[in-house]
Amino acid sequence: MFLNNTQARVSIGVLLLGNLLGGCATPKHALPEVQDNRVYAAAAEINAAPDPIARAVSDEEAVARISALYNKLKPAGTAVCRYVGEHHCDWELTYSPEEEVNAYASDAGTVVIYKGIVQYARSDAEIAMVIAHEMAHHIANHIRESQNSQAVGALVGGVAMALLLGDAAMYNSQVISDGMQIGAYAGALTFSRKQEMEADYLSAYIISRAGFDLDAGRGILVSLGRMGGRTTSTVLDTHPAGPERVAAWDLASAEIRAGSPMPRKR
């Protein structure tokens, strides 16, 4: 989609508005506050880490492995889900044979794990962290939050474009449509990074309760950081950068080891 000068000005305004709204959108849990020195240390660790290497894995092996890990995680995930107060705590595991390092939670109540996760993971704890992370998106009701924020963003974008164009907007529905698309994208950004950090936080509790080693689980974050190459987040990023995630994971791990039995609520 190409933007003329008028659309570009509105795009910037909508994105800035989305960023401001994101600052007001607080997670339900008291996430660890990550200091810059911890992020710098995590960035140095990621930069020094070897490049992740994929190993050959059959679909049968991958399905068996993630299914076993999911079943081991399920009681812990359900316990955290009930504690948070979410009523729907029954999810369905789905496997994708695509060799992409990816996973996601869908609005159908599913947790989708790609074959690439199994290929690059160096331990069961790393795969468990990914599965628990997607469980956490359901537990924290992130999907509905994202849908709502996109709807609000689309409305803001459309109204902003209409106000800017005035009467001319009546004759340029495409520009209004573009404004709504831009607004929906900005709305999605208002929650996404904080949702990812909250999902990491909850997943640390889930894998710990399931008996997995927290230090082993963090390895997948180091690998993802190595693959991604980003050291800091920008306004347009949907995920926090690798060093931010690793540093936050370490603080969550310390919180758990200090005796916190469940995620801290705000």
Model-derived features with residue positions:
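Post-HEXXH active-site segment of zinc metalloproteases
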Residues: 143-177, 218-221
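Peri-catalytic and regulatory segments of divalent metal-dependent proteins
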Residues: 25-152, 167, 205, 209-210, ...
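Bacterial N-terminal signal peptides that target proteins for export
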Residues: 1-12
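Metalloprotease/metallohydrolase-associated module, dominated by Zn2+-dependent proteases
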Residues: 168-216
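C-terminal motif of bacterial Sec signal peptides marking the signal peptidase cleavage site
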Residues: 20-23
